[in-house]
A protein has these predicted regions:
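NAD(P)+-binding Rossmann beta1-loop-alpha1 motif at the extreme N-terminus of oxidoreductases
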Residues: 1-62, 87, 124-127
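Hydrophobic residues in well-ordered beta-strands that form the structural core
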Residues: 28, 48, 65, 92, ...
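Beta-loop-alpha module in the N-terminal Rossmann-like domain of NAD(P)-dependent dehydrogenases
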Residues: 63-79, 97-100
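Short glycine-/small-residue-rich Rossmann-like dinucleotide-binding loops
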Residues: 67-69, 95, 120, 153
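Rossmann-fold NAD(P)-binding glycine/threonine-rich loop
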Residues: 86-89, 93-143
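Helical "substrate-binding/catalytic lid" subdomain
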Residues: 130, 134-136, 144, 151, ...
Length: 266
């Protein structure tokens, strides 16, 4: 399947690479020519500007935007809406505010252009691990894009399905969800990010306390010299706080046990 990608930063570029590994054809553009040239050397078609990207694609076109939320994305959607034709699709894979998705989808629909919002989680590790995706939009368009989502998703791997899921959408177990209409994808991702930040803050607070358990401000008999790297490692193995975020914390502490945890409060 052919996909256009606008924005070739740390996530956009790796999304293209993962798609090309799966046999998809990618037409790419970034305002910085260097990442486009790098991807061209790997098999992508690097366009000189947005209009040339659109011209290089076959109808119906599917163009994924991976830009910072806000003005940059708004400007790009306005540009694309003047270049695309009825039946084409714009996919926003960034962290757009979900109410903006609803507004955009309504405006684009008047031109016959489809809009899909994709909350994308996986970061720079997604190239190898895959991306968890929370998707909002009309079902026929989501179904048309399924080969793209299936290639980007992590797949089932060795994670067992939760019991009692008989009859539910099996794509969820592969790592991507059609959450609902436009806005639903980014709404779910917004809540995901809030949970993530809370977990990160809890880890930071906990390890900060452990790191300073030998503070000279404590009575001598209450001081504890603790190895925070070893604590992180043991918690990875069977504890109820096991998580990928803990894995990343353990990796960072193993490389630098004196890592500055940061302020333990907000």
């Amino acid at each position: 399947m052919q996909l256009g990608m606008i924005g070739l930063g740390r996530m956009g570029g790796n999304i293209v690479r993962r798609l090309m590994r799966a046999g998809h054809a990618c037409v790419v553009w970034d305002r910085d020519a260097a990442p486009g040239a790098a991807l061209a050397s790997e098999g992508a078609n690097a366009a000189g500007d947005v209009a040339l990207l659109v011209a290089a694609m076959s109808a119906p076109r599917h163009i994924w935007i991976m830009l910072p939320a806000g003005e940059a994305t708004e400007r790009m959607i306005a540009t694309l809406s003047s270049l695309l034709a009825a039946g084409d699709t714009i996919i926003d894979g960034g962290n757009t505010f979900w109410k903006d998705d609803i507004r955009r989808a309504k405006a684009l629909k008047e031109k016959g252009i489809h809009y899909v919002d994709v909350g994308t989680s996986g970061g720079v590790w997604g190239l190898e691990r895959g991306y968890c995706m929370m998707i909002g939009g009309d079902k026929p368009i989501i179904d048309r894009l399924d080969p793209i989502f299936a290639s980007l998703a992590p797949g089932r791997g060795d994670v067992p399905a939760t019991g009692g899921r008989d009859g539910r959408d099996p794509r969820v177990e592969n790592g991507y969800l059609h959450a609902g209409p436009n806005g639903a994808g980014h709404f779910v991702k917004m809540i995901h990010n809030g949970i993530e930040y809370g977990m990160m803050q809890a880890l930071a607070e906990g390890f900060d306390i452990l790191k300073h358990a030998n503070s000279l401000n404590l009575p001598a008999e209450h001081r504890l010299d603790l190895d925070v790297a070893d604590i992180a490692e043991v918690w990875r193995r069977g504890s109820v706080v096991t998580s990928w975020l803990l894995d990343l914390t353990a990796d960072a502490l193993a490389k630098d046990p004196a890592l500055e945890i940061g302020r333990a409060h907000v």
